[in-house]
Amino acid sequence: MEALIVSGGHLDEEFAVSHMRQYSFDMTIAVDSGMGFFYRQNRMPHYIVGDFDSVKPEILESFRNRTETDASESFQELQLQSTESADFEKQPEQRQKKPVILQFQPEKDETDTEIAIRTAISQGCDTIHILGATGTRVDHMMGNIHLLGMAMEQGVSCLLLDKYNRIRMINRGLVLKKEEQYGNYVSLLPFTPQVTGLTLTGFKYPLNDYTMECYHSLGVSNEITAEQAEISFQDGVLLVVESRD
């Protein structure tokens, strides 16, 4: 089950529309000012989450007026909700008439994007694409990158995407097909003190049983040269960034 989260960071709307057409998402979630994208595109998300401190009041009100159930609840209640009890009914987005609104207090321990990811996972999603999670606020972007680890530890594939980058976090091997690559460059950044036994095949700069350490730039800007490239390692966590100019 695949989810699309549109967060409140910088969003290239032409790219976002194209991405939605490329994939068939079972669930869409608008995060705070990210609901502006759905509003302008005349689309209805399944969920709207956040403290709503950055969205225009008239946009929020337009969705509230089309909502039967304003399901405001605490983050703790959301966290405890099981997939079995959620009873989320999949339906085509064009038939989705009324979103579920989850509103939270501005003073909280989790960002709105974290709440959105937890919402998707609680509904049984095993793949999550996040748009609008990069931009001018480096602290928010770094926080969103860290959230990839939360999803990874629960066995959920989570991607941050914008027009130029596709970012994921892995704790096991990965195969990248050249025909499906996101851009010309693949960067590998250790997210643990060491990534041991790292072997890269099908890349311009291969490695064999290498120990890659944090705080070095060795893994930046590699390139796929074969029909497919393989990343394997024994232990650690890697951030994989596919980029294009």
Say what each PLM segment does.
Residues 6, 29-32, 50, 102-103, ...:
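General beta-strand structural signal in soluble alpha/beta enzymes
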